[in-house]
Structure formats: structure tokens, C-alpha cells
């Protein structure tokens, strides 16, 4: 099925997560493919210089480590895989740093585990760092921290990580670059009747039946992981494109509105998806009461909540917990992720940010709840 929605999903995307797999990043297992990485970095630079924000999720550390260690086949022992990841991550980060710098774009290395994103405080810290980097025009290059996490090496995949990062930074779109042109109704290598899927709804159960299962010996995921990643990304309102990574100027053509690969469309708008997630799936831990001025800014303008506008704190909560923002009449205006614990919040009520360091000994954020981590409940 095709439609015009594909022409706008990437064209209108301001914040994009790009995931590239091992089979593309590496030169048939003989270390990193410098030319390919250089080409993607050139395209990333054009996107950033054009006003877009881009996060790169890249596989390749283990494959590069295998090459540097002289290993011809992927080992099975976890500690050997972790050793390869540690060795290879050095080269992977250096390659991206070099190629992005050649295009006058800064880069940053970020290693994450699923546990980092499952813990709300670490989630908030990771989000703040990534959003800051994007605001600086830097391209964060993210990989799983395979060296310290056994389960990710055994069962994880960077398709899932790409979707989690898309959720984390509230991306408008996820682009998964792979060694196939997209999704087919069956394996085209085995079934001559297989038809290419240009567009479908992310999360459609029929997609999982279509997807092939096995990946290459270098990587960890087949097409099924990409289908599930698109479903996860759609949960926060991000549409996903699965496309051939060697397609000339694939990223640039996608943002121009060209139809490349398979588009899996999120069925829920980004703000609506985030509001539903925060309102329905995270337990409310406490609340802050705000004065009339702060209430007006939150309600009418969707502004961040500053501690100077807070008049009271109820409940016991930690940084990263979900709290309610209420006006003087007890009406719930919004919900959001707290940047400070309840103990700290009580100290910060009615205080300007200039006094935070004196009161707490540090400054985490100037806001109690940032507008990017807040959803309005009324109005």
C-alpha cells in the first residue's frame, strides 16, 4: 500500500534517529567500512546544517574488535564478545568523530544499556544530556554498552535501542538503514511472488508474519527486530523507515519527501502518545502546588515549571518520578517528570535558580519540570 503520508513523515521531521547495522558499518567483517561511514556522516552533516537534529545509533563495535584482534569468526563466549566490544568501540567512536569533523560537525559518544532507560532517574539524565547535545548541533553516536551487559549481547539488538532512543529524545522519525531495500510480504530470495511493502501501519500484526527472522553472522537482528522496533517507536509517535543503507543519498532524499524503503506509520501523534504514556503508564508519586502566575504559564503557554512559582509539595518522590502540577484550588494542570526529589523541592519552593547551589550544593536543572517532560491534563 502506498499513500502520500510517506512524503511528509520524514520531510517534516525535525528530530531524527538513524540506526545503522553491523552488516553495513563493517566491510564484510573486515573492520569498519570507512567509505560508507564517511558517506553517512556527510549526509548527517547536511541535515544538521539544515536545521535538523540527528542521533546516530550505530552497531559495529564487536565486528571492529574482532578485526583488530584477528578473529575470523564471531565468538560464543560472553567474555570474549565483551572484550571485542571494548576493543572495537575505540575504533568505532574514532571513525565517526573523524568523518563528522571532516564535515565540520561535532560528535559525542554515548554508551547505553536498556537498564539506563528503565530507571527513571537515569532516563532523565540521559535525555537531558542528549537534548543538550542536539541543541549544540552535535551528533550523538550511540551504541549499547556491550562490555558490561550480558543480556544485550545474548538477546539484545540495536534496532530495539534505536526505538528506545527515539522514545527517549521524542524523535519525529526513526530511520533503520539495513542491507535490504525494505520489507517484503515474504523472503524475496526464496519466494519469487514476494511483493515489496511501500507503506503500512506500525504495529500491524500482519507485519510480524511477513518478517524474516535470521540475521547475518556479524549482526544480531533480522527483519523481525526492525518490525518490533517500529512498533515500539510508534508508541511515542515516531514513524519508521526501513531502507537500504547503500541507497545513494538515502537520508537526504527521505527528508526531501522521496519514497525510499518501507514506511511504517505511527498511528498516534507524538504529543498524544507521550501524554497517554505519562498519564496512564507511570505511577503518580507526588504533587506540587503552584501560584496563579505559574499556573497561567503552565496552563496557557505550556511553559516549564520553575520552583519560584511553587507554593507547596505533597508526597515523597525522587528525581525522575512523575508528579502532578496543581493550582491553588487543587485542579491538576499537568503531569511531568520531576527534576528534583520531594525533599529538595521543599527547599526550592519560592526560590530563584540563583539560590539552588547555596541550598542544595549543586544545580541539576533550573526547572522543577521541563516542558519537554510535561503533558497538560486540562485545556
Swiss-Prot record:
Single Gene Ontology BP annotation: L-proline biosynthetic process
Main subcellular location of this protein, as a coarse class: cytoplasm
Binding site for ATP: 19, 178-179
Localization (cell): Cytoplasm
Keyword check for Zinc-finger: no
Annotated residues for binding of substrate: 59, 146, 158
SMART domains hit by this protein: PUA (SM00359)
Tagged with keyword Cytoplasm: yes
HAMAP family referenced in this protein's UniProt entry, alphabetically: ProB
Protein name stated in the entry: Glutamate 5-kinase
Primary gene name: proB
Amino acid at each position: 500500500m502506498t499513500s502520500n503520508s510517506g512524503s511528509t513523515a520524514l520531510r517534516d521531521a525535525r528530530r531524527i534517529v538513524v540506526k545503522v547495522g553491523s552488516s553495513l558499518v563493517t566491510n564484510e567483517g573486515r573492520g569498519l567500512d570507512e567509505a560508507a561511514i564517511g558517506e553517512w556522516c556527510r549526509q548527517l552533516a547536511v541535515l544538521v546544517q539544515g536545521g535538523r537534529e540527528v542521533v546516530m545509533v550505530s552497531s559495529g563495535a564487536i565486528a571492529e574488535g574482532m578485526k583488530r584482534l584477528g578473529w575470523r569468526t564471531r565468538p560464543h563466549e560472553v567474555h570474549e564478545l565483551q572484550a571485542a566490544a571494548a576493543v572495537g568501540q575505540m575504533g568505532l567512536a574514532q571513525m565517526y568523530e573523524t568523518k563528522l569533523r571532516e564535515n565540520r560537525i561535532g560528535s559525542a559518544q554515548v554508551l547505553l544499556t536498556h537498564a539506563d532507560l528503565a530507571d527513571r532517574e537515569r532516563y532523565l539524565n540521559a535525555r537531558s544530556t542528549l537534548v543538550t547535545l542536539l541543541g549544540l548541533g552535535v551528533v550523538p553516536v550511540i551504541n549499547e554498552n556491550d562490555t558490561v551487559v550480558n543480556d544485550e549481547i545474548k538477546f539484545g539488538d540495536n534496532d530495539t535501542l534505536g526505538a528506545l532512543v527515539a522514545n527517549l529524545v521524542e524523535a519525529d522519525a526513526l530511520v533503520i538503514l539495513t542491507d535490504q531495500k525494505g520489507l517484503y510480504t515474504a523472503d524475496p530470495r526464496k519466494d519469487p511472488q514476494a511483493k515489496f511493502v511501500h507503506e503500512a501501519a506500525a504495529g500491524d500484526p500482519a507485519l510480524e508474519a511477513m518478517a524474516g527472522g535470521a540475521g547475518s553472522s556479524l549482526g544480531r537482528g533480522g527483519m523481525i527486530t526492525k518490525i518490533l522496533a517500529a512498533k515500539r517507536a510508534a508508541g511515542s509517535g515516531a514513524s519508521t523507515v526501513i531502507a537500504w543503507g547503500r541507497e545513494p543519498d538515502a537520508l537526504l532524499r527521505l527528508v526531501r519527501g522521496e519514497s525510499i524503503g518501507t514506511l511504517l506509520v505511527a498511528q498516534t501523534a507524538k504529543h498524544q502518545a507521550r501524554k497517554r504514556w505519562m498519564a496512564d503508564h507511570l505511577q503518580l508519586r507526588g504533587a506540587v502546588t503552584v501560584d496563579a502566575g505559574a499556573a497561567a504559564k503552565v496552563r496557557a503557554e505550556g511553559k516549564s515549571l520553575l520552583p519560584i512559582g511553587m507554593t507547596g509539595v505533597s508526597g515523597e518522590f525522587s528525581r525522575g518520578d512523575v508528579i502532578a502540577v496543581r493550582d491553588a484550588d487543587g485542579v491538576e494542570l499537568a503531569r511531568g517528570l520531576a527534576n528534583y526529589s520531594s525533599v529538595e523541592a521543599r527547599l526550592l519552593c519560592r526560590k530563584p535558580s540563583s539560590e539552588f547551589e547555596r541550598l542544595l550544593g549543586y544545580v541539576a536543572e533550573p526547572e522543577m519540570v521541563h516542558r519537554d517532560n510535561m503533558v497538560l491534563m486540562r485545556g
